[in-house]
Design a protein with these regions (language model features):
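Short linear sequence signals and composition-biased patches located at protein termini or domain-edge surfaces
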Residues: 85-170
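Extracytoplasmic beta-strand-rich oligomerization domains located immediately C-terminal to a leader/signal peptide
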Residues: 1-80, 127
Length: 170
């Protein structure tokens, strides 16, 4: 198990050492609720919520995942989606589109694996679509002002300690 950044176009996961005085450390696979952790590695991730978490067929917004790295890996390997979803929280239901890209110092990539590539990307691009709900009817407002609107945003986050990695030679 390694710390670093792991991502695709539709999800991003950061894993880092995060020791906690309040955490209760338990053997891997134990069913202890609350602050129980199996290791000091903490994973934080972002993705669009999926239809299995809601009653709609559409993605439900920006979701944040936080949990013990070993326990999340074990749940994923065992196909235990319930344990994986337990750490998923909806943070921005108005987000309707989310795309990540990773800059290796030479070109943009659609995926990143710090373990396989030997480091962090030099930058991460985040494309967000945010949809505002339709407005409630009010006399004097035109019909077009009551419709849902979607705005797109682009944010590039530089990781200044990262070194360029020529991934075309890997």
């Amino acid at each position: 198990v390694v710390s670093g950044l792991f991502g695709t176009t539709d999800s991003l996961r950061l894993t880092a050492a995060a020791p906690s005085r309040r955490a209760v450390y338990v053997p891997l696979g134990s069913q202890v609720p609350g602050m129980a952790r199996a290791c000091d590695l903490l994973t934080v991730g972002y993705q669009l919520g999926d239809a299995s978490q809601t009653m709609s067929a559409q993605p439900s917004g920006l979701a944040r995942l936080e949990g013990d790295r070993l326990q999340l890996d074990l749940a994923q390997k065992n196909g235990d989606t319930q344990s994986q979803m337990a750490g998923l929280q909806m943070v921005a239901p108005e987000v309707t589109g989310l795309v990540f890209a990773y800059f290796d110092g030479y070109q943009w990539r659609s995926d990143w694996d710090s373990q396989a590539l030997g480091g962090l990307p030099m930058a991460v691009e985040v494309l967000l679509d945010i949809t505002t709900p339709p407005r409630v009817f009010r006399p004097g407002y035109s019909a077009s002002s009551r419709q849902a609107t979607t705005q797109s945003f682009r944010l590039v986050v530089a990781l200044p300690l990262a070194k360029a990695i020529d991934t075309s030679t890997l």
